[in-house]
């Protein structure tokens, strides 16, 4: 991570650690599981060098941010409220939003319910919430059932020096960073609460209608993503009223910001200009 301002911002009864760098057109980067703002270490200096004001929070439950105990605190509506509150705290009316994994779900919903706060949207890996689940997608989400079992999931993931986590990610991602972050007291449970609050089998699906996304939207999927079916991202343009563009990155894993930083940076710069 480049030198800059890392600070705590109080929002919605919790404290979020936020990386705040540069000046210019604002870009808000939202990570997913099991990451933190550190996921964006290749994007932050690049965007700052091209004249952008870059903001990257550790979302609630991750990194150095607060870990609410109540599972319901991790509902997506609260994460969306956090995004709006971060913009308020920084005195920003609107920003470009970039989201990966759970962060993509958060940015989709922010664009739907706070359209005036989103200039342009970039979603990595995760399709629009209304995109129908294919049978392949249902198979790929097997791990989300494990994550529902409090205590059992934590023990499984940590067993034998976090062997499950290493195997699950197939050698991709930030293993040592994840393990260091998730080893802090309460951190692993807090991170899994995103799944318990939003992806439990007993929960109803998204409502039959959601507001259309009016912001210009770029959807990016990578061919070695073992958790998301690319067909769903490709077809997400049906839920976007504004300009839509789909890009596929060959050979990259689920963690596009790490596996294809140069290509992602290229796409971001082109989209935001």
Model-derived features with residue positions:
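Flexible "cap/lid" subdomain of the alpha/beta-hydrolase fold that forms the substrate-access gate
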Residues: 2-3, 14-16, 26, 62-98, ...
């Amino acid at each position: 991570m480049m030198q800059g301002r890392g600070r705590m911002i109080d929002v919605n009864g919790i404290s979020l650690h936020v990386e705040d760098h540069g000046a210019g057109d604002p870009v808000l980067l939202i990570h997913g599981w099991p990451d933190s703002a550190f996921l964006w270490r290749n994007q932050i200096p690049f965007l700052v060098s091209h004249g952008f004001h870059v903001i990257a929070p550790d979302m609630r439950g991750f990194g150095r941010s607060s870990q609410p105990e109540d599972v319901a605190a991790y509902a997506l509506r609260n994460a969306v409220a956090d995004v709006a509150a971060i913009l308020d705290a920084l005195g920003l009316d609107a920003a470009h939003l970039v989201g990966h994994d759970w962060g993509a779900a958060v940015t989709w919903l922010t664009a739907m319910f706070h359209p005036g706060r989103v200039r342009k949207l970039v979603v990595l890996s995760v399709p629009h919430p209304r995109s129908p689940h294919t049978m392949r997608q249902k198979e790929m989400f097997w791990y989300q059932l494990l994550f529902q079992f409090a205590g059992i999931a934590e023990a499984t993931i940590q067993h034998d020096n976090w062997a499950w986590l290493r195997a699950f990610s197939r050698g991709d991602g930030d293993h040592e960073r994840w393990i260091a972050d998730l080893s802090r007291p309460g951190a692993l449970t807090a991170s899994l609460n995103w799944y318990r609050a939003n992806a439990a089998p007993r929960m109803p699906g998204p409502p039959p209608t959601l507001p259309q996304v009016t912001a210009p939207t770029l959807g990016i999927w990578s061919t070695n993503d073992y958790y998301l079916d690319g067909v769903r991202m490709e077809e997400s343009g049906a839920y976007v009223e504004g300009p839509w563009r789909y890009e596929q990155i060959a050979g990259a894993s689920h963690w596009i910001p790490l596996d294809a930083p140069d290509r992602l940076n290229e796409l971001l710069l082109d989209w935001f200009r």
